[in-house]
Each structure stands twice: as C-alpha cells, then as structure tokens.
Amino acid sequence: MRVTWFTQMISSALVATITGAYRPFGAHAMAALEMTAEQAGVELADDDKEAVAAQMRRLPAHPEVASALRRLRDAGLRLAALTNSTEEVARAQLEHAGLIDTFELVLSADTVGRLKPAPEPYRMAAERLGVAVDQVRLIAAHAWDVAGASQAGCATAFVARPGKVLDPLVERPGIVGADLAEVADAILAVEQQDDRRRP
C-alpha cells in the first residue's frame, strides 16, 4: 500500500506541476493517502493522517548514505539538499537521519512555487549556491527527478536502488550506481580527472 500511496502522491504532484496548479507537497501526500485508502476501502481518521505526516519526518536513511555524503563533503564538494517537501519537513528528516550537518543548504521547491521536475527548483538551487546551473550535479533515485534536473541544465547522477530504473526516453545520467557509495566513488573519480585537466 505504501508504494501505491507514494506513486499516487508523485502523480498528483506532477499533474499539479504540469497544469500550474501549485499545492505544497504535503497537501499532495495527504490527498494521495486519502485516495489510496478509498481505493482499498479503508476509512482514515484524522489521527491516522497525523501519524503518517509524523512518520514522514522520521524516515531513515539507507545505511551507506551518511558515509558517502561525508566523503563528498570532505573532498571539498558543496552539498545542498533539494526537496519537494517544505524546508521544515526536510530539516526534520535530515535531523532524524543524522545528515543535517553534511549539507551547506537545505532547499525546498516550495520557495519557487513549482515542484520538481519543473526547472525552477533546480535553477533556484544553482542560484542559492551562487553557481551556473551546469555546475550543479543532482543525485537522485527517481527517474523523474533526474529528467527534470537534466532538462534544467544540471549534470545528473542516478542511484539505481532495487526497483528503480531510468526512463529510456530521457538522456542517460553521466553517473549511475547501485547505491550512494558507488555514485560517490564515480563523482570523486570525475572530480580527480577534472583536477588533472586544470592548469
């Protein structure tokens, strides 16, 4: 049921983005929860919705994430978290996962009133970092996020976790790895090559 709910949430958010009917991502999450429950013939009480909202703030990170992010940061790369959630929810999630200190910035698409994969959030991230959009590399485990970032002009990397596949109609990311550790290894290798080419 969780996969159905998440898929419905992303679908609702994409429809809103395409049609220009912006709603905060949390509103899509709750609407998708209601739709999924209705499809399953389950009645939701307000307490149930509040419990799901609270759980979204306490999602655990995959085991390799903390060390992979720290390796990237310690190599001198600037890290920013870019999410469709509000900044408040994103900060709560990162705090709970013990990752907040690895990021220079926590950015929300909510700031620009357009959800990813619209180009505005990616461009806002580049602007907040003070770099050109083509100097940003988005790392994501969702093909739609990689597609949006690529269309906005970012370099991309895809975390191909089990069940996650790339859209064959979208330009393939420069980096693909089975988990964030593999992606970090590849990014650091690219950075070393770039350093050797610089005069």
Predicted regions and their residues:
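Conserved acidic
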Residues: 1, 21-25, 172
